């Protein structure tokens, strides 16, 4: 019982860390901090938050979906995860545009402008954000919803939460990404594999957008 309470407390503090980071932008705006100081603070905040969340993952130990894996196994699944995520993103994005006449991803374009203006912000966008999102939406939400529901319902709920958080015009693309990364997490049995795939995918999409 004490072990369960300790795990639940760990998950709570992981989620709280993420919420505090998401609130940082609002706090900085209220303090009228803008421009470079604003993005420097967000970047540093994201590094601290991601580091703390990684520490909390290590502290909690593996959950029911996780096993100790080899580097070769992890690299193979990162490649599968990245290629699948990129292909799925373009496929669903094309279908979404064709059927619903949705515009380009407002979220991607906004991040692109920020990274162009403040290059160091890529640390947040390409590295810290994917790590934190995988820990929150796959390890905290998805993994903890599997037992009270089932793996499919858990994946759908966590994917919709992931899409809702991004507040983007291409909602279906983010739902698909959420489902795909849940699949990669389940199959690889390692949260850092889905995080690695997410990092490489973000880097690829933003690099292609810049070119």
Predicted feature residues:
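Active-site His/Glu-centered metal-binding helix of metallohydrolases
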Residues: 131-136, 140-141, 168, 200, ...
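Juxtamembrane helix-loop-helix connectors linking adjacent transmembrane helices
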Residues: 63-129, 147
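Membrane-interface helix/loop boundary segments of multi-pass membrane proteins
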Residues: 135-156, 186-190
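Alpha-helical transmembrane segments and their helix-entry boundary regions
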Residues: 10, 14, 66, 154-155, ...
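N-terminal, membrane-interfacial amphipathic/helix-forming hydrophobic leader that caps
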Residues: 1-76, 80-87, 98, 203-211
């Amino acid at each position: 019982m004490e072990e369960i309470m300790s795990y639940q407390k760990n998950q709570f503090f992981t989620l709280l860390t993420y919420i505090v980071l998401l609130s940082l932008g609002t706090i900085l705006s209220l303090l009228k901090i803008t421009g470079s100081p604003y993005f420097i603070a967000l970047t540093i905040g994201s590094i601290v938050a991601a580091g703390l969340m990684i520490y909390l993952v290590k502290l909690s130990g593996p959950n029911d979906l996780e096993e100790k894996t080899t580097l070769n196994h992890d690299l193979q699944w990162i490649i599968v995860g990245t290629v699948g995520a990129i292909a799925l993103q373009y496929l669903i994005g094309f279908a979404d545009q064709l059927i619903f006449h949705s515009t380009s991803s407002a979220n991607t374009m906004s991040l692109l402008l920020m990274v162009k203006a403040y290059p160091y912000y890529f640390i947040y966008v390409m590295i810290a954000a994917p790590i934190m999102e995988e820990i929150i939406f796959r390890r905290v939400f998805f993994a903890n919803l599997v037992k009270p529901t089932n793996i499919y319902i858990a994946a759908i709920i966590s994917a919709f939460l992931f899409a809702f958080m991004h507040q983007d015009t291409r909602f279906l693309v983010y739902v698909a990404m959420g489902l795909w990364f849940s699949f990669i997490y389940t199959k690889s049995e390692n949260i850092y594999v889905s995080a690695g795939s997410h990092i490489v995918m973000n880097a690829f999409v933003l690099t292609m957008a810049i070119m």
